[in-house]
Amino acid sequence: VHPVSRLDRDTFGVVLLAKNAHAHALLIAAEKHKTYHAAVRGVPQPPEGMIDVPIARLSPESLLRCVRADGQSARSAYRTLRTEHGISLLELQPLTGRTHQLRVHCAWLGCQILGDPQYGGAESGGPGQQLCAVSIRFFHPFLKKWLEIRSEQDVSLDFPDGMVV
């Protein structure tokens, strides 16, 4: 089995795998569109848009990332689907593939992903990091048609009283 897509450690949802090296090479080269849902603290302004800021390592030895002018180009589209009690549900689409991209971009937007231990949302007290890869759409190299895989899981906006600050 060969991974075609990957997820950060605490992110959940769909991943794309290939059965062999040939299929892997074809799927890596194929056009893919990923969609994520995130429960975030706050309400992004504007409610939808494009985040286009570069991402770099926090320091040469660090695994963490930050927005910095000398970083690699990183672009993410976002749209607010719902807001309730100061928590927003965002639809996110990474247009580049940087490490921790969506988590860093949400933090830069001022709307940290709930339950994110590295980028400011850990104190939410909720049920883990609320970032889910809800779908991946890709052109199947053998079937010669577009396919979409959807997750049966999604982020949770149902927090007991007092758990979200």
Where are these regions (language model features)?
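RNA pseudouridine synthases
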Residues: 1-165
